[in-house]
Amino acid sequence: MDSAAKDIMGKIAAELDQEMVDWIGRQKIFFVASAPLAESGHINLSPKGGDTLRVLSPNVVVYQDFTGSGIETMAHIRENGRLVIMFCAFEGAPQIIRLYGQGEVVTPKHKDFADLAQLFPQKAGVRSYIRLKADRVTSSCGFGVPFYSYVGERDVLDKWCVQKGPEALEEYRQMKNRQSIDGLPGWE
């Protein structure tokens, strides 16, 4: 086992330290998990990528949420706030970092939307920002995570959003994102 792996195994903290923040900044993909309160509800796990996440403080991160075919994360946060974000190393030393906490949906109607928008490259199709206040930060070994080579970002969603334009995107959200697959309120 290399020394970098020894130093990161099994940490539990209330917030991110600078080493974790730097490591998160180098990751090309992260995963977001949420669930409804209902026992029969569907758990959701979504991959995210690109330059879409910022660490705002040792226990607050935010990511861009784009128009898409689903609205599960937003609906679950609105119902119960629970959210987990996971990062894992696909290159270099193995590591997994999970951020557990309460999520908040910041839509264009929210007072913080414009300020958060300034933190990111502007792209068509931004539906909201998802802000997570973490109350538990864990790292684990990641020894079972395979190596993958990063090839590049996909531009399909961005091109689709640009082609649709703002009005058609809002119509799409009203048609496809009004509620989750379990019937929870989504886009308003």
For the regions a language model picked out, list residue spans one by one.
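Binding-site signature for planar aromatic cofactors or substrates
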Residues: M1-E188
